[in-house]
Amino acid sequence: MPSAKSSDLSPTKTNLESTTKQKVSVQDIFLYIPNLIGYLRIITAIISFLCMANHPVATLIFYGISGFLDAFDGYAARKFNQGTRFGAVLDMVTDRCATSSLIVYLGVLYPQYTVFWQILVSLDLSSHYMHMYAMLSAGSTSHKNVDETQSKLLSLYYNNRLVLFFVCLINELFYMAVYLHYYKFFWLGTVMLVASTPIWLFKQIANIIQLKNASLILARMDAHDHSKRD
């Protein structure tokens, strides 16, 4: 009786890989390490909101923790290969909600500048939403994949993780400094406000540019689609 070939008796490498790979469930995605960090960011941000009216130091601590953790969710996603669409959106939504909530409270403390705060919230939300929507609609896997042909400033802002982290951090420090200034914290308030203003201005310019670029991307796609119809 002829002997069976060894290739017939042993599973192939592909079969071994397929049997060892585990199916990732929806619950697994929610429990990925970067997403757990995202939930912790949300919790600490909410605690800071609860402290804003009467406990400025506690607000600074918890809001600071929420912002500082922003540096670690992306790192964890890369280190453990746990980058997800849900995590990317959770990260951006948390950033936008935290910043907007702080600015809203600044409107309570400084009602004479209400229109100014409204414009800042509108610019922040609209520019980031339109940028993300435009990039994903254009086929990009991430809203952070910006090349120099679109904008050198945005390319530097999104592709250099150090620049992105520090610009976002100092932008948040500006709003926190305005908050602390109301409570007469001179060194933490007024001095930090003056020091952070240039980077805050840079961030607003970046928001305007990404709003403009996103509008152009969407308009070009619309023009292409309508040209094909005609």
UniProtKB/Swiss-Prot annotation:
Q: Where does Mg(2+) 1 bind?
A: D70, D73, D91
- For the Cytoplasmic compartment, the record's topological domain ranges are 1-28, 78-89, 134-161, 206-230
A GO molecular-function descriptor: metal ion binding
Catalyzed reaction equations:
a CDP-1,2-diacyl-sn-glycerol + myo-inositol = a 1,2-diacyl-sn-glycero-3-phospho-(1D-myo-inositol) + CMP + H(+)
The annotated active site, in chain numbering, is D95
Q: Give the EC number(s) under which this enzyme is classified.
A: 2.7.8.11
Q: What is one process in the GO biological process aspect for this record?
A: phosphatidylinositol biosynthetic process
Span-the-membrane segments of this chain are 29-51, 58-77, 90-110, 113-133, 162-182, 185-205
Q: What happens when the gene is disrupted?
A: Growth defect.
Q: Which cofactor is essential here? A: Mn(2+); Mg(2+)
User: Which enzyme class?
Assistant: transferase
Thermal activity profile: Optimum temperature is 55 degrees Celsius.
Regarding activators and inhibitors, the annotation says: Inhibited by calcium and zinc ions. Inhibited by nucleoside triphosphates and diphosphates.
Name the positions where Mg(2+) 2 binds.
Answer: D70, D91, D95
Name the residues that bind a CDP-1,2-diacyl-sn-glycerol: G74, R78, T84
Recount how this protein's activity depends on pH: Optimum pH is 8-9.5.
Q: Keyword set for this entry?
A: Endoplasmic reticulum, Lipid biosynthesis, Lipid metabolism, Magnesium, Manganese, Membrane, Metal-binding, Phospholipid biosynthesis, Phospholipid metabolism, Transferase, Transmembrane, Transmembrane helix
Classify the protein's membrane topology as the record does: Multi-pass membrane protein
How are cofactors bound according to the entry's free-text note? Answer: Catalytic activity is higher with Mg(2+).
Q: Name one GO cellular component term.
A: endoplasmic reticulum membrane
Broad class of where this protein is predominantly found:
endoplasmic reticulum
Q: Which residues lie on this side of the membrane: Lumenal?
A: 52-57, 111-112, 183-184
* Family the UniProt entry places it in: Belongs to the CDP-alcohol phosphatidyltransferase class-I family.
Q: Name the job this protein performs.
A: Catalyzes the synthesis of phosphatidylinositol (PtdIns). Required for proper membrane dynamics and cell wall integrity.
Query: What is the protein named?
Result: CDP-diacylglycerol--inositol 3-phosphatidyltransferase
